Amino acid sequence: VVSNASDADCVEMNSNEFAYILYTSGTTGTPKGIVRDIGGHIVALKWTMKNIYNIDSDDIWWSASDIGWIVGHSYIVYAPLFKGCTTVLFEGKPVGTPDAGAFWKIISDYKVKSLFTAPTAFRAIKKEDPEGKFFSKYDLSSFESLFLAGERADPDTIKWAENLLNVPVIDHWWQTETSWAISSNCTGIEMMETKYDSACKAVPGYDVKIIKSDKSLAKPNEMGDIVVK
C-alpha cells in the first residue's frame, strides 16, 4: 500500500483554522461539539509532552485509549507527532488479550517509557492478577511513569500500582473541552508532593479557582464550583 501511494502536498493553513470538531461524552448533559484551533493546539500539546510527561523525541510513549476520545486524539495521534517521538497504537483490552499481562508485554517489547491510561484499566488488571504474577514475567526497566485520567483514580488502585510498578503513578485531570491537562504533577518540570485523591496543582497556563454560590473564593475544605481560566 505504501509503495503504491502517491505523495500529498502540504497545505498552508491559518493557525486559527479548525483542526477538528470532537463531541463530549454527554455525561452531564447534551454532547457539545468542541472546535479545536490548529496553532494553539500544536503549541500546547508539544509543550505537554516534555513538561508534563517528560517525553523526548527519542522516547517511546503509549497512550492506551481510543482515537475517538480526546485522549486518543491528543495523545495517540497529535502530541507524539508534534514531539517527534514514537507512539504505540494498541487495539485490545488490558485483560483477556490474551491475559492480564498484555500491558506489561507491550511495555517490555517496545521499551515504553511512559503509559497514559484510565484507572478502569488498572482496576481490571488488579482484579485479574492482584499479586502481579504476570508483571514479574516481563522486563519493564524502560518504564518510568504511569499517568491516569478520565475518571476518579481511587487510592487503593493507585497504591496497588505504585507498589507493583515502583514508579510514580500520577492522577491528572482534564476534559474534552481543554484537550490537555488542567492539573497534574509535571514530571518534566518538577515533581511535587501530593496526596491520594488529588490531581496535584494547576498546570502552567491555567488559573483554577473554587467559587462559592455568592461568587466569593472558597476557603480550604469548602465546597464550590470549579472555575478555569
Q: What are these regions, as identified by a protein language model?
A:
Residues C85, K113-T117, K126-E193, D207, ...:
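Gly/Ser/Thr-rich phosphate-binding loop
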